[in-house]
Amino acid sequence: MANTTSAKKATRKIARRTIVNKSRRTQMRGAVRIVEEAIASGDRDAALKAMIRAEPELMQAAQRNIVHKNTASRKVSRLSHQIAKLAK
């Protein structure tokens, strides 16, 4: 347990940030899940619309250090590639 007042304050701040980060991570995962479901159903138009919403979510999560920027880029790339395969 924290002994100094600054350590106690840091613990409180971490708890608040954890709640915010979990919320943002859940929102990001939900956006990705919608894209994946549209791809699985074979609906290219729905997948494109969902991807337009998911890509900014991923990039903002990377910008806020919720996920690593390479992880976000990799997810965007893989989803885009799967959507492109639907057109063929």
UniProtKB/Swiss-Prot annotation:
InterPro entries, per database record:
Ribosomal_bS20 (IPR002583), Ribosomal_bS20_sf (IPR036510)
What UniProt keywords are attached to this protein's entry? Ribonucleoprotein, Ribosomal protein, RNA-binding, rRNA-binding
One GO biological process term is:
translation
GO molecular function term, any single one: small ribosomal subunit rRNA binding
The UniProt record lists the keyword DNA repair: no
Q: Does the keyword rRNA-binding apply?
A: yes
One GO cellular-component annotation of the UniProt record comes to: small ribosomal subunit
Which HAMAP family does the protein's record reference? Answer: Ribosomal_bS20 (MF_00500)
**The family this protein is said to belong to:** Belongs to the bacterial ribosomal protein bS20 family.
Q: Main role?
A: Binds directly to 16S ribosomal RNA.
- Indicate what this protein is called per its UniProt record: Small ribosomal subunit protein bS20
Task: Give the species this sequence originates from.
Answer: Rhodopseudomonas palustris (strain BisB18)
Origin organism lineage:
Bacteria, Pseudomonadati, Pseudomonadota, Alphaproteobacteria, Hyphomicrobiales
